[in-house]
Regions:
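Positively charged n-region of N-terminal signal peptides that target proteins for export
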Residues: 1-4
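Short beta-strand elements that form the blades of beta-propeller/WD-repeat-like
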Residues: 20-27, 32-33, 57-65, 69-70, ...
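Short loop/turn segments that connect beta-strands within beta-propeller blades
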Residues: 37-38, 73-75, 110-112
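A short beta-strand motif characteristic of beta-propeller blades
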Residues: 40-51, 77-83, 115-119
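Mature extracytoplasmic domains of secretory-pathway proteins
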Residues: 44, 54-81
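C-terminal partner/receptor-binding element of secreted or periplasmic proteins
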Residues: 102-122
């Protein structure tokens, strides 16, 4: 029983070891810096590959580079690519969702890049 508990504890430690909590993003010049909840810089990304950061939460951030919207996890890994013509203008990021406006419509998207809801922009 002790061996099972020890194995479970070790596996949980390794699974969460790389997961950072994104507290702040600083975009200066050609670099984007990610900071954790202790205020420590833990990742540096190039603006030439990421583009412009449009918004962030503690678990992910949204960036635009040319005609593409990219979703990145808190560790700075790109995991989803969406077209600007589909998403439109990103209005904000909150929690595990982000909101965009495309023409006369406002869309709410999940952090996975799935459209959750649509409403008229009035």
């Amino acid at each position: 029983m002790k061996k099972i508990l020890l194995a479970a504890a070790l596996s949980l430690t390794f699974l969460t070891a790389g997961a950072e909590t994104l507290s702040s993003i600083d975009q200066t010049g050609t670099w984007i810096y990610l900071y954790n909840s202790q205020g420590r810089k833990y990742k540096t990304l190039s603006t030439s590959s990421v583009g412009e950061v449009l918004g962030y939460s503690s678990t992910f951030f949204v960036a635009r580079n040319g005609a593409w919207i990219y979703l990145y996890d808190a560790d700075g890994r790109k995991y989803k690519t969406l077209s600007v013509s589909t998403v439109g203008e990103v209005l904000g990021v909150a929690g595990d969702t982000f909101t965009s406006r495309n023409g006369a419509w406002i869309y709410t998207w999940s952090r996975d890049g799935r459209k959750i809801s649509t409403r008229s922009a009035r």
